[in-house]
Regions:
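Membrane-penetrating hydrophobic segments
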Residues: 1-13
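Conserved N-terminal structural module of periplasmic/extracytoplasmic solute-binding proteins
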Residues: 14-121, 198
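Loop/turn elements at helix/coil->beta-strand transitions in domains of secreted/extracellular proteins
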Residues: 39-41, 73-75, 105-110, 162-163, ...
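Structural recognition of the beta-strand scaffold that forms the well-ordered cores
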Residues: 42-45, 110-114, 165-168, 174-178, ...
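Pocket-flanking alpha-helical
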Residues: 86-130, 143-166, 176, 256-260, ...
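Hinge/lid segment of periplasmic solute-binding proteins
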Residues: 116-214, 412-431
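Helix-loop-helix "hinge/cap" segment bordering the ligand-binding cleft or interdomain interface
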Residues: 156-284, 296-347
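Glycine-centered hinge/linker elements that transmit conformational signals in sensory
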Residues: 249-252, 282-370, 375-377, 384-390, ...
Length: 436
C-alpha cells in the first residue's frame, strides 16, 4: 500500500515549546519509487535517547503499535532518533530532509520534529499539509498567542488560516537549578573572602544545609580557597543575585576570580572540569538576552514578517540599524567578558560559565547530579537525571545486565540525592536593570 508522506516539526527556539508542522511530500508529477519508508509512518528527530521527550515518545509509539496493530488500515509507527538520523540539531535535520525532497528520494520521513525554518523551507516545495478544514487542528484549538506564532511564515498570505506548526509540548528549557552542597561551599568561601551572604534571603534559606562538605564527593571543589580575606569585600549574595541572567554571570566571574588552589591539594587526578554556572541551549539563552536588550518586543527584533502584496516576507530593516548592530556587539562582549577560568591541575579547570553542548554527555542536569557545577539553567523535564533515581542508577553505571545492589550503592555514593538538588522555575529576567 503506497501512503502519502506527511511532515510534523517542532519549535523550541522561539517559544521553548514543541510544535508540529505538517507537509505533504509527494507530487503527482514527480513519482518516487517504492522504498523502505513505505507502509509505515516514520518519525525523525534530532534528539537522542537521553532526551526526556524521546524516552516518553518511544514508549508512546510502542504502545500505539501494540494497541492498534489489528485495526483496519493500520500503519506501524517507527521513531528514528538522532542515533538513526545522524542529525544533532533541528537545522541539520531540516537540511537532510530538504535534500531528500530535492533529490526525489524515497527516504523522506512522514513526521519530523524541527522548527519554523523547516516549515518555511518545506513550504517552498508546496509540501505543507493543509489543515484548513480540519475539525480539531484549527485556530479555536490553540491559545491565541501560540496560534499567532505558528500560522504565519515567509511566503504565506495574510488571509491564510493554515496552521504551519502544531504545539506538541510546553516545557521550560531554562529552569534554574542548584546543587545545594556545592552552593553552601560557595557561600562559605564568599564569607571567608569578606563578602556578605544574606541569610534572610529566600534563596539562602532554601539552599542552606549544615553538613554540606560531607555530601560533596571527592571533587576538586575541596582544593579551593580564597585569595585573601578581603577579596570579596563589597560583594553581597542575596535573592537579587539569582533573579536575572546578568547578575548570575557577574557573580560567577567575580567568585571564580577570587579563588586559588590550596598549596597542598587533597584531591588529585584528572576529572571533569568544574563550573560555577552551566547553561543548556546557549544559543537560545543568548537570543533571549539579545531580545531583552533590543526592546523586548516583536517589533524591535532584528527581523520581522512584513506584508507586501498580500504575502508575508522577512524584513531585516532593524538588523541594518547601527544602534542594533552595536547592541549585538555589546551583548556578545558581555557573554565573553564574564568568562574566566582557574587552573585546577591535571588538565582540569574551573570555569565561571559554561555552555553545555548537549548530545550524549554534556548537560547541566548531569553536572548538577555529579557535583560538577554549582548552579545551572536546565530543562525541568530532566529532573530525574539530576538526582539518584531509577533512571540514573540504570543508565550511568559501568556494568551491563540487571541492576545490582552495588550499582545502587555506587549511585548513592557519587550522585546527588533529591534533597541535595533544588529546582526553581524558569529564569525569565535577563537584564538586571530592567526586570519587567
Amino acid at each position: 500500500m503506497r501512503k502519502r508522506t506527511k511532515f510534523y516539526m517542532y519549535s523550541i527556539a522561539v517559544l521553548s515549546s514543541l510544535g508540529i508542522f505538517l507537509s505533504s511530500c509527494t507530487r503527482a508529477s514527480q513519482p518516487v519509487q517504492k522504498g523502505e519508508f513505505d507502509d509505515k509512518v516514520v518519525i525523525q528527530t534530532a534528539q537522542n535517547q537521553f532526551y526526556p521527550l524521546m524516552r516518553a515518545f518511544s514508549q508512546l509509539v510502542d504502545l500505539y503499535n501494540k494497541q492498534f496493530a489489528n485495526t483496519p488500515g493500520f500503519l506501524p509507527v517507527e521513531l528514528q532518533q538522532s542515533e538513526k538520523t545522524n542529525a544533532t540539531s533541528e537545522l541539520q535535520l531540516t537540511n537532510n530532509v530538504v535534500g531528500s525532497i530535492r533529490s526525489n528520494s524515497p527516504l523522506v520521513p512522514n513526521i519530523i520534529l524541527a522548527d519554523l525554518n523547516a516549515a518555511y523551507q518545506i513550504n517552498g516545495f508546496n509540501r505543507l499539509l493543509d489543515l484548513s478544514n480540519n475539525p480539531i487542528i484549527n485556530e479555536s484549538y490553540f491559545d491565541s498567542d501560540i496560534y499567532n506564532n505558528f500560522n504565519k511564515i515567509s511566503g504565506s498570505t495574510q488571509s491564510s488560516d493554515k496552521v504551519y506548526a502544531i504545539p506538541f509540548n510546553l516545557t521550560t528549557t531554562d529552569s534554574l537549578v542548584f546543587n545545594k552542597p556545592v552552593m553552601n561551599l560557595l557561600f562559605s568561601l564568599v564569607e571567608q573572602g569578606g563578602g556578605t551572604v544574606d541569610k534572610n534571603s529566600a534563596t539562602y534559606k532554601e539552599l542552606h544545609m549544615e553538613d554540606f562538605m560531607e555530601k560533596i564527593p571527592n571533587k576538586k571543589w575541596k582544593n579551593l580557597q580564597v585569595k585573601s580575606n578581603e577579596i570579596y569585600k563589597g560583594l553581597t549574595v542575596d535573592d537579587k543575585t539569582f533573579s536575572n541572567l546578568e547578575s548570575l554571570f557577574e557573580f560567577s566571574k567575580k567568585f571564580t576570580e577570587g579563588l586559588e588552589l590550596k598549596q597542598t591539594p587533597t584531591v588529585t587526578g584528572q576529572q571533569r572540569d568544574l563550573k560555577v554556572f552551566m547553561l543548556n541551549y546557549g544559543p537560545n539563552i543568548y537570543q533571549k538576552y539579545l531580545w531583552s536588550k533590543l526592546g523586548n518586543s516583536r517589533d524591535s527584533w532584528l527581523w520581522n514578517l512584513k506584508l507586501q502584496d498580500n504575502q508575508f516576507d522577512l524584513d531585516f530593516s532593524n538588523l541594518k540599524k547601527t544602534a542594533n548592530q552595536n547592541t549585538i556587539g555589546e551583548t556578545y562582549d558581555f557573554f565573553k567578558n564574564n568568562y574566566t577560568t582557574l587552573n585546577l591541575n591535571d588538565k582540569q579547570v574551573l570555569k565561571s560559565i559554561y555552555f553545555g553542548t548537549g548530545g550524549k554527555s554534556d548537560w547541566a542536569a548531569w553536572d548538577i547530579r555529579n557535583f560538577d557545577t554549582a548552579f545551572g539553567i536546565a530543562s525541568h523535564v530532566g529532573w530525574n537525571q539530576s538526582v539518584v533515581s531509577p533512571f540514573t542508577i540504570r543508565t550511568f553505571r559501568s556494568t551491563q545486565g540487571d541492576v545490582t545492589q552495588q550499582d545502587i550503592n555506587n549511585a548513592k555514593n557519587n550522585f546527588a540525592s533529591a534533597d541535595d538538588v533544588l529546582w526553581k522555575t524558569q529564569l525569565t529576567k535577563l537584564d538586571k536593570n530592567n526586570l519587567n
